């Protein structure tokens, strides 16, 4: 089972998740309380995983119609849902796992986490906003730009 399927398996009993061939070009996914989560049928596997995480973020964190992103409150709710998605499928532990497996390039990390590069970059931007340039986590120093991970014991502090 791939990561997209695992995420579907975790949530399908709580919210309907449908791949829809009729979605307009340019709309990757949408969550509504009536239809659940609709995903555009023209996505790649990694796009499905990335978009589903954000749409589940909407399910978990927002209510009501927030389509009009010129409304500041709606924009804030969109950001909250995206951040929820980042934390759901790209945890600091996942970045450390990549490091431990010698998965170091953006392409390799995205392939391993089954996400698109834009999702990873936006996630790292969010983590930089949350933690700053780097963060000590568990037994590691995670440098967020450019992404690099080091064991604390290997650092000359």
Language-model region placement:
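Active-site hotspot residues in diverse enzymes, especially metal/ion-binding acidic/histidine motifs
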Residues: 1-51, 56-157
């Amino acid at each position: 089972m791939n990561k997209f399927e695992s995420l579907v398996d975790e949530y399908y009993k709580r919210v309907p998740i449908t791949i829809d061939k009729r979605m307009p070009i340019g709309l990757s996914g949408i969550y509504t309380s009536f239809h659940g989560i609709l995903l555009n049928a023209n996505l790649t596997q990694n796009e499905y995983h990335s978009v589903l995480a954000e749409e589940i973020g909407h399910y978990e964190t927002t209510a009501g119609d927030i389509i009009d992103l010129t409304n500041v409150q709606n924009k804030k709710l969109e950001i909250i849902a995206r951040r929820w998605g980042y934390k759901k499928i790209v945890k600091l532990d996942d970045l450390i796992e990549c490091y431990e497996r010698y998965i170091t390039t953006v392409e390799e990390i995205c392939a391993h986490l089954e996400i698109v590069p834009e999702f990873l970059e936006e996630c790292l931007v969010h983590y930089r906003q949350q933690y700053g340039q780097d963060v000590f986590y568990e037994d590691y120093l995670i440098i967020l730009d450019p992404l690099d991970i080091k064991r604390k014991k290997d650092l000359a502090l």
